Amino acid sequence: LHSFPTRRSSDLAHPHDGAGQGLIKKIVEISRRPEFLGKIIFLENYDMQLARRLVSGVDIWMNTPTRPLEASGTSGEKALMNGVVNFSVLDGWWLEGYREGAGWALTEKRTYQNQDHQDQLDAATIYSILENEILPLYYARNRKGYSEGWVKTIKNSIAQVAPHYTMKRQLDDYYAKFYTKEAKRFKELVANNYAKA
């Protein structure tokens, strides 16, 4: 790890989101200032190919949006499907997806209304979790050169979280919650030559 925090951003703003585009422009401008060179890296032209490279090149996917402003967090879902462990605020998809032992999370609830105070607390919490939980687990190598605990966390993530974000789960939910109920209702309506219609 670097001796200073490095932020990577590859966000896209909706074409009609002028405020979002302005924010991204401001981040890029700040990242070019001498005091931030090497500390903020903005990856331009984010697309599926770049996402694939990012996902295949990391061991942990850290996403720390301001609560409750995470739109969804699909990049974390992509990472999950590729065996990457997540560390995020309990917001967006991670609010539903998080399972203890299958990744790490910052609390869902804010402690402070003042955003600066909340950011300071979140930063301290992030570093504490990184230094006291994540890094020791990651670097606890056995004689074969890998961390059994880290591999267990990856397996837990794939087994306990990933199945909830598949097309099969989505189709099963659709079938159980909508299709079967509507099919039953249809049969009732057409029975006895549409007597109940």
Predicted regions and their residues:
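Catalytic binding pocket for nucleotide-activated donors in carbohydrate/polymer assembly enzymes
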Residues: 55-164, 168-182, 186-189
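Active-site donor-binding acidic/aromatic loop of nucleotide-activated sugar
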Residues: 38-47
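Structural alpha-helical scaffold elements that stabilize or flank donor/cofactor-binding regions
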Residues: 1, 53-54
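Short hydrophobic "strand-cap" motifs at the C-terminus of beta-strands
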Residues: 10-11, 43
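Short, structured helix-loop element that forms part of the nucleotide-activated donor/catalytic region
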Residues: 13-36
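Surface beta-strand/loop "capping" patches
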Residues: 190-197
